[in-house]
């Protein structure tokens, strides 16, 4: 048996591996773009397959595609969505800017799968009916992003928030020294500190959800340039109806399809919100690293779970590996967002020509953030222990507590008391008792660290 077979397209003949399901156009792309060795993510291929399925159903409902071909295309698409033939989509993500190579890769594989089932289906005339790469690929960016954010990222963030809430409630009255500029400040509770992280995450969730809702509007039906040439007038409406049924998401048709093809503003907006998630995760990771620092000459407020030896030369050293991993993943997300922003500038006239890059980057961002959120919840937040002695020993001696005396004795005298406490190393309450004119019980009431975490004026 020959190692290759000959396929033909409008440019001529091409040798294709004999056992490959793809055809001539896919093979040309494989030959033309040996750039990264990274194909489009599987979630993107699944989204294109969903688009092909809904398009076949729409075309059949309008009388343009016979039921036998529709059923063969739909069955092939279901197989692709379920991960079958995953090795048949090798086209590099750094390819033609419209993503035509990936669109044709999917078209050709679907046609081949249908042929195996005994139905002759043409990749262009039937699988790609009423479509262009120029509306399929932007639509696939939307569909794949919506699907992965809803099924992966939002559940991961919700799990992280829930884990933080559990620890937050546990430490609601554990007082610690607050820090501004990394310097000692007024006391807070560990619960307040944890709640801050949770509130940040909840806010980013809402912003991501809003960006996802914007992505529900699809440019499918705009075909080549946004006008809808070669697509029936009713196609776009029928398409979103079937896609919503097939996926369970309430997709809608973009009124002015040009804006979803010549520009990618909605994907860029989602990317920015994903960057926002990365920024929050970085803040949490950095706080955890500082709180865990030491254990002898650092803050040593908490102890993160010991997950692996930290050094190949220093015995006994254990490092905060989960926060470090989360910080690196978050940095990568921020870099990917910058790339998406640059790609968003590449909308020349009627088509953006960095579509595969945007689609792949968004899915990489979702993967990184989902996984980072999960390990942060399960391997850091869940298992850290609190070093109560360290927290309690420092907070009561903190000269900054004299801030609570400002309303009673004025800023200037309070500053002098703080300076003397710093200079002598004596407890600030002892210095205040000598110099403030207030008795010990009053000072204890005013400078009670737990009371000070509740705000107000004593």
Report residues per predicted region.
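Conserved, well-structured ligand/cofactor-binding cores
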Residues: 1-458
